[in-house]
Amino acid sequence: MRPMYETQADRNNEQRVADLLAEKGYSLDKLPMSFGLDVAITDDFEEKIVAFAEIKARTFEMNKYPTAMINLHKVIRAHDISACTGLPSYFIVLYRDALVRINFASEFEVKMGGRSDRGDPADRDVCAYYPISGFTVVSQF
């Protein structure tokens, strides 16, 4: 079984995203790990789920790299959820200078990727690389 790497900093970043989306009229509801994505997004006015999302935070600016990477299993899960519910699923990234989103259904490139700083061989896997040019800026700071 893989270790859990979610930290308090990760939870703080998710709260920051929730606060930024609340300014736009949306609430985030944390989903159980078994669901495969982080949150359901609810329209506060209509009080219904309008999308699902996986949230990542990066410690650099949005345009530092030409793509944003995420594990392919998250993309597959997002596609399954969207196919079942008819609702979009988004990859939301909190950068140092912006909060951005892209629909998981957007085009991406498949390559090996991941990290090596934790010494966990399972951190390297098949990943989806979404072009930064395809992201929509939700908030700029």
Where on the chain are the PLM-derived regions?
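Intrinsically disordered, low-complexity terminal regions enriched in charged/polar residues
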Residues: 100-141
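Mg2+/Mn2+-dependent nuclease catalytic core
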Residues: 58-77, 81
